[in-house]
Swiss-Prot record:
Cofactor: Zn(2+)
Cofactor annotation remark: Binds 1 zinc ion per subunit.
Species assigned in the record: Halalkalibacterium halodurans (strain ATCC BAA-125 / DSM 18197 / FERM 7344 / JCM 9153 / C-125) (Bacillus halodurans)
GO BP term (any one): translation
UniProt-recorded name of the protein: Small ribosomal subunit protein uS14
Known partners and oligomeric status: Part of the 30S ribosomal subunit. Contacts proteins S3 and S10.
Length: 61
């Protein structure tokens, strides 16, 4: 889990647009966040396996 202080810091409007970054909506993780779903890879995988993300299914080839 991300620190509450870091999540609060990120939510504030930044002075420069470049300083803004994405965070996972579910756990607050700052790395490997998918913009389309606003989830990190770990949360995305958990929810996809449970079938809670519409239109996402496990690939097999």
């Amino acid at each position: 889990m991300a620190k509450k202080s870091m999540i609060a810091k990120q939510k504030r409007t930044q002075k420069y647009k470049v300083r803004e970054y994405t965070r996972c909506e579910r756990c607050g993780r700052p790395h490997s966040v998918m913009r389309k779903f606003k989830l990190c890879r770990i949360c995305f995988r958990e929810l996809a396996y449970k079938g809670q993300i519409p239109g996402v299914k496990k690939a097999s080839w």
